[in-house]
Every structure is written in structure tokens, then in C-alpha cells.
């Protein structure tokens, strides 16, 4: 029997009986029994409640903690003025917080974070701060409770990718995003073309600036579809 370890990976080579004995020893030492998911909890500021049909994620607290960037009234009247180092730091902090929330449980926050990050590292003015505050305000109006139903492992599933993009005629680098869903596979029917399989399970999502230029709205959409297909 040979046991090799590289960083956080373990490779075990041996006879079937030796590997079975190794697995039994590991289970005897570290098995904590069958996990019971009947307790509500708070994780990274999000409240998680578990029920017989799945679990619910409430992210209202993390979103409510975010505050708009302070802007003096006189500066609001001059949106083309350059932002101060303190305002740039606040802008970066807001983008980072939104990106964290978005990656954890809120796809719309991912889009807002990506949109704000595009203005960081270049000459920015007060209008960027006003736009960031406006996007944050609209984001906080969205439903903050997300339900994740339990999947029946006896079903057959398919992965469905949804993509979208916005064309940027000035820079030619559009904003793109995609959602990856796990849906129960159903036999084709006349109604299948107009309905979405339910329940559906959101697996992954992303929103970012396109890495390639597009000369038209159609080109931006094709790049978005290609990105969704790659993932």
C-alpha cells in the first residue's frame, strides 16, 4: 500500500482489502454520525433556515449594513469634479462588499459590484459615486430571501445556461453575465417551449466586463453565450 500526499490531496494505492480497511479506520476516527439539518443558523451575516422542502437564505442583514458613499451637497452639484482619495477608498470598499455578498448568494449584487469595479483605477468623477449610490439603493429594494429546494436524486437533470450582455459602444467592452441552472429533465412537449422546468436549482453565476471587444450588440450577446457555454 502506498500513501502519497501533495498539498491538500491524498493518493492511496493498494489492494481492495487494504483500501477498504483504510476507509474503515478513517470513518471510525472522524465519523460524526448522520447530520441533522433542523437548526436555523447565521453564517457570514446571512440567516439560514432549514425546512423539509429545502432551505431559505435571508441576506437582508448584509445588504442593510451597506451604506451609500457620503457626498457633500456642494459636490453633488458638480458631478464632473474628480473624486478624493477618501471617496475612492469608499468606492472600493463598497464594490468589495457587494462582490462578497454577490458571490455568496445574490447574483444582482455581483452585477453591481462588477459595474462599480470598472470605474476603479481610472480617472473617476463624482457622477460615478452618484451612480454607485443609486445602484445600491435599487439593489436594497430587491427581495432578499432566496429559497433553495431540495433535489430529488432519482430525477434526471440537465444543466441550462442563461446569458445576457449589454453593448458598450464607446469602449467596445460590454458587460456580460450568466446563470447556470440544474433543471429536471422532462420529455419534450408542446408546452415545454413556453414553460420553465420547476423546481430549478441555481448552481453558479457571474457578471464581469467582457475580455474581448464587440462591434455590435449581437457580437456582445454571442460573447456572453460563449462564456456561459465554457462554464
Language-model features and meaning:
Residues 1-231:
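Long, low-complexity, charge-biased intrinsically disordered regions
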